[in-house]
Amino acid sequence: MMKYLIFIFFLVLSGCGSTHKKPPAPAPAVQNVAPRQNTVQIPIDSWKYKIIDAATDEWIFFGQQKVIIEQDDESIPHVGAWEDDDWAHIERVNQYWRAVGMSKLSGKDCKEPWSAAFISWVMREAGVSASLFPPAPSHRDYLSHFLAVGQNPGAVFVPHTIQEYKPKPGDLICANRGAGYFGDVVEELPSSLNAKLHCDIVVQTDAGLLYAIGGNVRNSVSKSILKLSPDGFLQLTRHRPWFLVIENRLD
């Protein structure tokens, strides 16, 4: 089977209101989804596994779109379903918005970034209480909470810079977003946050690669594949200016 490869030079984490049109799908082929395996080597009854499982289910529902990030280049070897492709996916995005109290929005509202609503929904589906992970329509809201309480004894979501902590399955990785944004590596935790942020859920690390699932990534629930540094740390890239890792200490 020929590989279906599209190079993206200016990736914008936005909905279908962007100027990008959906690429044509590859020739139809029968796709067999492999049985779910515990590839992350964590207990299947743990909170982390439930979070990863919920995120993976949504990725499968949206057609398993993949985004490969290699230095400053990005590609989409497999295009999945987009937020406004059909009623099922339009309504699924509505379910994410309902998790943050915004029930009137759906996949048709293409200019409303829904990545934070997606993560809030995943946390709720996994059974994480709102007292531990406050649901929010904006990443800045829950990240500001973690920055304020993350150093308290017993904190379960603890922020780190990308230089001081190696991301693990169940963690969140966060980046600034917006056209043309590209800054230096953050050496200290910020005291305030940009309104335009994006976070993904780490689902696997293996052989120097990190796999993370997020909503509203190229108009879908996508799995991004990143190359870690030789020491296993997240690397800043032009299209993904990562600056923060939220360590998940839930058992």
Label the predicted regions.
Residues 216-251:
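Low-complexity, Gly/Ser/Thr/Pro-rich intrinsically disordered linker/tail segments
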Residues 3, 19-20:
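Large, modular interaction/toxin scaffolds in secreted and membrane-associated proteins
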Residues 2-8:
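Sec-dependent signal peptide recognition
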Residues 1-2, 173:
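Short hydrophobic/aromatic-rich beta-strand motifs
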Residues 66-70, 132-135, 185-186, 223-225:
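Short, solvent-exposed loop/turn and secondary-structure capping segments
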Residues 135-218:
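...with weaker cross-activation on analogous glycine-rich loops/strands in unrelated enzymes
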Residues 12-15:
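C-terminal motif of bacterial Sec signal peptides marking the signal peptidase cleavage site
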Residues 20-131:
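N-terminal capping segments
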